[in-house]
Amino acid sequence: MRIRLARQFAMLLAASGIAGLLSAGAQDGVSTNGSGSRAQTVIEAEQEKAKHLVPQEPPRGEWKFDHIQKNILDRIFNSNGPSLKFGGIPTGGGFSLGPQYTRQDLLADQLTWNTYFAGSTRKWYGGGSSFDFHDLLNGHLELIADGGYQNSASVWYFGEGPDSSKSNKTDFNREFTTTHFSALGHFFDQKLTVGYTVGGLLVHVGPGDLSGTPTTEKLFNGTNTPGLVQQSNFITGTTTIQVDLSRVGFSNPEGLQLEADDSQFFDQSGLQANFHLLETQATYYLPLTNGMRTLIFRLRNETAFAEDNQVVPFYLQPTLGGPDDLRGYDRYRFYGDGNSVATAEYRWSVSQTLEMAVFGEGGNVYQRPGLIGFRDVRGDGGVGFRIKNKQATVMRLDVGVSPEGVHVWFVFNDVVGKLSRIF
């Protein structure tokens, strides 16, 4: 009896186990089929959605500025052939315009030739021609030859030093004829540039032609203004070092840029005007909010060192004032054998083509190298607008305010661009 009950119990237990296994298998099959069905449904839904996707259009304002860049700015400023030259005249000469011819595709795209002539609303005029052999030796060598002529009909002069008075505003005519031959080496993926430039400079100074403003020789003389009565001709030599630790950003670079130029002036006229001019600049671009906003800090110093018993002619002295440093002051407001300037600018991008800015600046001039420091600092502030082409500013409008009034500048360069020479 007990054996029969045990057999029945074992058979019942086995039947229950088999039924459980079959039930579990059926549930797993249903679950697997359900998961596969849901995954297939998701895939089909995504494919159907993809059929109706369209590219996202930029905001209407940004589209308009991009259209201006591609159809107007690029054709004007990046033309390969005849075009218009905006600028080309030293700042202070008024709005300038003229014809230009550029070829960027010569010698297998390794030679760029540019020739231009421009005149301004203040009767300044000039022109130049350059040959730039670039990308030689796998991009490590660049050779440049250029020549030019500038006739600046009414350059302002207020006297030398930080205490010069605005009431002593005069003007003079300045003519520069120049030629240069440069050899530049580029290393470490263009991060380091070193080079040397040899050149010649012919100078003539005469009375200015600005009506209502006395000419410089009426208020100043050769004793307090070296080079006013007689001008020198020079052979020049400039050593250049540039270190670019920046990278490409949304509309401005990001990082640090360092520059130094040391120019020797060898007087060929026997007028005791041998000197050298040391120019240094450090610029730091700090990106904010994914590069749409940028803080820019710039420090620049220019100091002229005259040899023993020599002088620095006033027409080659470093100056402060104008669209590139103290924008709240007249162009060429302060002359001296040295100057320092600090600039802070906050920029925000409306698009990659349009940018707005607020800025503040401070700077001073000194009459000999030993007086470098923070004496007699002048300051200003203001707002500005820039029209840009890729990473470069091609046009800007700045309004600077200082104790000497409000000044408006419309120019074709970047306020914190590379060091530039007037000679």
Regions found by a protein language model. Give the residues of each.
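Outer-membrane beta-barrel initiation region
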Residues: 25-144, 205, 223-253, 323, ...
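Transmembrane beta-strands of outer-membrane beta-barrel proteins
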Residues: 82-84, 111-115, 141-147, 192-196, ...
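Transmembrane beta-strands of outer-membrane beta-barrel pores
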Residues: 86-92, 103-105, 117-123, 133-135, ...
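Outer-membrane beta-barrel architecture
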Residues: 100-102, 130-132, 182-184, 240-242, ...
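Extracellular loop and loop/strand-boundary signature of outer-membrane beta-barrel proteins
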Residues: 115-117, 164-170, 221-228, 264-270, ...
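Outer-membrane beta-barrel translocator domains and adjoining extracellular loop/strand segments
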Residues: 127-131, 155-163, 206-215, 252-254, ...
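Outer-membrane beta-barrel translocator/channel fold
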Residues: 140-182, 301-319, 395-415
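Extracytoplasmic gating/loop element in the C-terminal half of outer-membrane beta-barrel translocons
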Residues: 287-363, 367
